[in-house]
Amino acid sequence: MPELPEVETSRRGIEPHLVGATILHAVVRNGRLRWPVSNEIHTLSDKPVLSVQRRAKYLLLELPDGWIIIHLGMSGSLRILSEELPAEKHDHVDLVMSNGKVLRYTDPRRFGAWLWTKELEGHNVLAHLGPEPLSEAFNAEYLKARCAKKKTPIKPWLMDNKLVVGVGNIYASESLFAAGIHPDRLASSLSEQECEILVKVIKAVLLRSIEQGGTTLKDFLQSDGKPGYFAQELQVYGRKGEPCRVCGTPIVASKHAQRATFYCRQCQK
């Protein structure tokens, strides 16, 4: 599933081609996504794009009279293409632009979403989200306070969007390794110093992944069709049985809330 770095990479890739251009019309080939494509998107016509923003894993296209909310789901991607390039089987939505480009949404598993809203504030998919991990609001004091009475393992708690947005399975595993914290540790057991370290490494890991264009494991591609390269730097995720790059101990895989977790028994306590 695309996580925050992949969505931010997509945002940065499509923004220069959309802002300042006008959506001439939309082509919805298959509107049966996680939720049905909003009716307003089917009928888009002559709408200039004012900005391309991101909140958590949602891309937000600002138009004069409302917002398009896009979620990439499990396998979705956005590409900027020339208008004449024919659509393929899993190309479900196009925005045809005035500059001769097309924003094409591809989603083999159809778990993504294309929604419309007049106002972002209070929309049900955005209303209960925690702070952005790269913002000043996500700091050691905040994390310590939110962990203080939490009797659940730290790994799934980091992946809870009510705590902090966009830290999915890959980056939770990588951040806990970088912080030296075992994923089975109860959130309430983290010290102030550990919270400070964890916040710093989460920010560093996410920023590094954004610089590398995200992590390509199976489905994710950047808006230009190229893969993300952070997968080449993964320390634990997807490396079950391989030697830890720090100490040589074989990487262990386990399950948390039905999600694979990877860690080093020696380096993480």
From Swiss-Prot:
What keyword terms does UniProt attach to this protein? DNA damage, DNA repair, DNA-binding, Glycosidase, Hydrolase, Lyase, Metal-binding, Multifunctional enzyme, Zinc, Zinc-finger
Record-annotated residues binding DNA? H90, R109, K150
Tagged with keyword Ion transport: no
Which cofactors does this gene product need? Zn(2+)
Report FPG-type zinc finger ranges.
235-269
Location of the active site = P2, E3, K57, R259
**What EC number(s) has UniProt assigned to this enzyme?**
3.2.2.23, 4.2.99.18
**Superkingdom of origin organism:** Bacteria
InterPro entries associated with the record: DNA_glyclase/AP_lyase_DNA-bd, DNA_glyclase_Znf_dom_DNA_BS, Formamido-pyr_DNA_Glyclase, FPG_cat, MutM-like_N-ter, Ribosomal_uS13-like_H2TH, Znf_DNA_glyclase/AP_lyase, Znf_FPG/IleRS
GO BP annotations listed = base-excision repair
Please name the SMART domains in this protein's record.
Fapy_DNA_glyco, H2TH
A GO molecular function annotation here is: 8-oxo-7,8-dihydroguanine DNA N-glycosylase activity
**How is the cofactor bound, as the UniProt entry phrases it?**
Binds 1 zinc ion per subunit.
Ranges in coiled-coil conformation: none
**Family matches, as Pfam families:** Fapy_DNA_glyco, H2TH, zf-FPG_IleRS
Q: Which reaction does it catalyse?
A: Hydrolysis of DNA containing ring-opened 7-methylguanine residues, releasing 2,6-diamino-4-hydroxy-5-(N-methyl)formamidopyrimidine; 2'-deoxyribonucleotide-(2'-deoxyribose 5'-phosphate)-2'-deoxyribonucleotide-DNA = a 3'-end 2'-deoxyribonucleotide-(2,3-dehydro-2,3-deoxyribose 5'-phosphate)-DNA + a 5'-end 5'-phospho-2'-deoxyribonucleoside-DNA + H(+)
Q: Does the keyword Protein biosynthesis apply?
A: no
**NCBIfam families under this entry?**
fpg, PRK01103.1
Recorded hits in HAMAP family, A to Z, give: Fapy_DNA_glycosyl
Q: What does this protein do?
A: Involved in base excision repair of DNA damaged by oxidation or by mutagenic agents. Acts as a DNA glycosylase that recognizes and removes damaged bases. Has a preference for oxidized purines, such as 7,8-dihydro-8-oxoguanine (8-oxoG). Has AP (apurinic/apyrimidinic) lyase activity and introduces nicks in the DNA strand. Cleaves the DNA backbone by beta-delta elimination to generate a single-strand break at the site of the removed base with both 3'- and 5'-phosphates.
Query: What is annotated about its quaternary structure and interactions?
Result: Monomer.
**Family assignment?**
Belongs to the FPG family.
Q: What name does the UniProt record give this protein? A: Formamidopyrimidine-DNA glycosylase
Which organism encodes this protein?
Enterobacter sp. (strain 638)
